[in-house]
Amino acid sequence: VTKLDVRRALRLALLGVLMLPAAVAHADPPAPVPQPVLPPLPLGAAMRIGPTAGTGTPTRDYGVGATDLCEFMEFPSGLLQVCGDSFAGQGVAFGPHYSPIALHVDMDSVDDATGVRYDGVTGTDKPLLADPTPPASSQLPAGIVAINRENYMLVTTTKDLVPATSRLVKAVPYQGNWPTVPKSERSATYAGGRQSQISGYYDPIPTVESPSGWVYIVANNFDRSAPVELYRVSPQKFTDRSSWQGWSGLPGGGWNKAPTPLWPDQVGELSVRQIDGKTVLSYFNGSTGNMEVRVADDPTKLGTAPATTVVFATTWPDQADELPPPADNQLAQPYGGYISPGSTLDELRVFVSQWNTLPQADNAPYRVIQFAVNPFKP
């Protein structure tokens, strides 16, 4: 074998390597596989599936008689719903208090037309978070971002529901003591006070600026005093909050600018997911009191996307725990609005909280109710 033969062989080997398809970033497929569980809903219509957690539900069997929020967190080993201030009794401030907690979702129930069921809880016998709660304060879940089943949660520390600080924690399935991500804590005034509540998703489609795609994040103020703003960050830099790039819709704007509101309404809790290539945002509209969803071709178009009302806010009935017929989507004091795994663009399943704060009500019901909606689409 001559040196020329060796060089030719090396060239051929190198050419073969160069012709191999490039490695492409990818997101884990959804689990369970999205599918409808109800008869088809008319466009724009919503249907109540029923209460799932809190007052009057079987979560009392796990020492959780009253709870709210219940945002989903997916792992290869199962599914959690992270809830906020929770109590052993049937209303706020009744019995021992825990916050946050994680309900263990029975996976077979996610696509059950009668609603989600649970088979356990983490956070009642020992804290869910590693960092202790400051005196007279609460540590509340303020948004979950999953990057290929690696789950991060924003925790906002509040006093009387007024935000003081926010930080990222790394979730550990079915265990407590979730650790704080180093250097992720910020004052509630960070980013103009409009980054104490978030939601996000990972889109692996590569771009020139980020070959591994982007994590898209919607953010606002925990106290519902501000509109929604949009950020993106490469998945490798997500935990560095200073690297989040804002989106500006102003002339000459775009990415890596000071963020501007996607639309003017004041917004509360947020839940954004990518479903069948569309960006889907569920949220509490603090300007109207209603629960709404928007579907857009990409996150920068959420502000101009049509809004579908999932729940219309109304007054409390004489019997506060009574609910109207399932097709009547009126509910007193709704908030939350977290998107369920298994949702499709024609049947988006949303978990809405309800808390009776009337002076005569003893802070009950305090619960989470599952709805389905067929939202308007672009």
What residue ranges belong to the model's regions?
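Catalytic cores of extracellular degradative/oxidative enzymes
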Residues: T304-A305, Q333-G337
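Beta-rich carbohydrate-recognition and catalytic domains
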Residues: P30-Y62, E74-P135, A146-R194, S210-D265, ...
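A generic alpha-helix preference that emphasizes hydrophobic side chains
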Residues: L15-G16, A22-V24, L69, P141, ...
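Substrate-binding cleft of secreted/luminal carbohydrate-active enzymes
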Residues: R349
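Secretory targeting and sorting signals
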Residues: V1-D28
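Beta-propeller and closely related beta-sheet repeat lectin domains
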Residues: D68-E71, K126-V145, S196-P206, G268-S271, ...
